[in-house]
Regions:
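Structural signature of hydrophobic alpha-helical transmembrane segments
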Residues: 3-18, 67-82, 133-146
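C-terminal transmembrane helix-loop-helix hairpin of multi-pass membrane proteins
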Residues: 5, 129-190
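Hydrophobic core segments of alpha-helical transmembrane domains in multi-pass membrane transport
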Residues: 6, 13, 44, 49-53, ...
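Generic transmembrane alpha-helix signature in multi-pass membrane proteins
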Residues: 21-29, 88-93, 104-106, 113-126
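Cytoplasmic-side transmembrane-helix entry/capping segments in multi-pass membrane proteins
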Residues: 35-46, 70-76, 98-109, 163-171
Length: 190
């Protein structure tokens, strides 16, 4: 039951982008096309889940054992950077089109505060490994859901005339807020 609550909460209620405001840069930057958003979501899901496992193990079996907690942030960043490099190499071989579409945003996963934030939150909330993985994967699904919905809406908005003062970031942030309201109201209606 606890896993179901974590799953639903991380996707809908405490969405990492829409409620906790982590990962806004890729959310706004890679959300112009649904196809690109789906690719970015998959890459973030992979890196986020694997990074949570690796950082959890490093925290419990290295940093805590040797009382090196002050190295947590830099260690986690290095782990995330290594995983992103691995994803970049794999995508370049497997899907060159997606690799090109993601462009500069793929290496920027390294600095995506969503991934570092989740790795640190798992430690701060004192989750065990399985609970941490469920939380990380659910958070990745929530990030992906928000990103794909937002990309779909931005594709539709590109077809209509938007007043000059609302174009770009203003309408994007209003749309993100409406997505958050709709996800929260969906849960309230159940």
């Amino acid at each position: 039951m606890e896993y179901i609550l974590i799953f639903i909460s991380a996707i809908f209620v405490n969405n990492i982008v829409l409620s906790q405001f982590l990962g806004i840069c890729p959310f706004l930057g890679v959300s112009k096309k649904v196809e690109t958003a789906m690719g970015m979501s998959a890459a973030v899901a992979f890196v986020l889940t694997i990074a949570t496992i690796v950082t959890f193990l490093i925290q419990k079996f290295v940093l805590d054992v040797f009382d090196l907690g002050y190295l947590q942030t830099i260690t986690f960043i290095l782990v995330i950077a290594g995983l992103v490099q691995m994803v970049e190499i794999i995508l370049k071989k497997v899907s060159p089109a997606l690799y090109q579409a993601l462009g500069v945003f793929l290496p920027l996963i390294t600095t995506n505060c969503c991934i570092l934030g989740v790795a640190i939150l798992v430690i701060q909330k004192d989750y065990d490994l399985l609970t941490g993985v469920v939380y990380a994967f659910s958070t990745a699904l929530g990030f992906g859901l928000a990103l794909v919905l937002f990309a779909g809406l931005r594709e539709q908005m590109s077809l209509v005339k938007i007043p000059k003062g609302m174009q770009g970031t203003p309408i994007a942030l209003i749309t993100a807020g409406l997505i958050n309201l709709s996800l929260c109201s969906l849960l309230l209606s159940i």
